[in-house]
Amino acid sequence: MRSGGRGRPRLPVGERSLLERPSPPKRRLIPRAQLLPQLLLALTVALVFYTIWSSWHSQTEELPLGRELRGPLIGSLPEARVRRVVGQLDPHRLWNTFLRPLLVVRTPGSPGNLQVRKFLEATLRTLSAGWHIELDSFTASTPLGPLDFGNVVATLDPGAARHLTLACHYDSKLFPSGSAPFVGATDSAVPCSLLLELAQALDQELGKAKERAAPVTLQLLFLDGEEALKEWGPKDSLYGSQHLAQLMESTPHGLGSTRIQAIELFMLLDLLGAPNPTFYSHFPRTARWFHRLRSIEKRLHRLNLLQSHPWEVMYFQTGEPPISVEDDHIPFLRRD
């Protein structure tokens, strides 16, 4: 992993409105065309969630927590519904409204970090679905001394028995003093903007699901402190996910369970934004969900709903993953 640099003093955020776009440093932006493959990922996540809550609402009211859900519950959406979902996603809104405000230096404890955190909270609070927003604030020992961190946790219906949890990190990598400003577009502003676009595009549908008390709900995690501050290692990385996973493990949820046990499926989005991304299945337990995403990609291709997509399957690849990945999923995986 990359090595970092010296920390920056924490300064008060100015008088700028939380929803006003910050003035980022000069940089080369990602071409919009390169974001279209990432919008596919938002599409697939949206479609999987539609499938889950539509099927589970009618079939799993009495299913005990902890019991895995099997293939018969994974249905297929009608073509008209697929096209409607695709039509609700807006790449221009993704770019201008959600991504641009995130393209600032946002290392832990910096003014940009706090500003982005408040932007995430404020944006989620504007949605009509009525998300329950929590801030997991904590101070951790780091190679640079004690630093303040904050995870943003958005849960559509906190009372639902199960959570489909989508996660990303919003902090950017710290580089030595004098380096060019690093805003971490792919690492990981784009994933954060994808989750915001997903929540906005499905705002009405998610609100309806919440009203009828569907047994599975959507949860979004915006994690702080993923990046190492000096050198990647177990004591210098994943600050936010380690703290939140520990907190969820010790927090009751329903009868005889904890918040981490309520997570039925955990999907981490990171390092997205470059052209032609590829994804591999890393865990046998979630292989069926990976193949579901692969099937959705094929279906979107056959329906001619994808741009710059000459082959039936480009992104969700079969075979062994080329490398193992240490990322924010690890603290949750260890407690599963």
Identify the role of each PLM range.
Residues 1-336:
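Secretory-pathway/membrane protein signature
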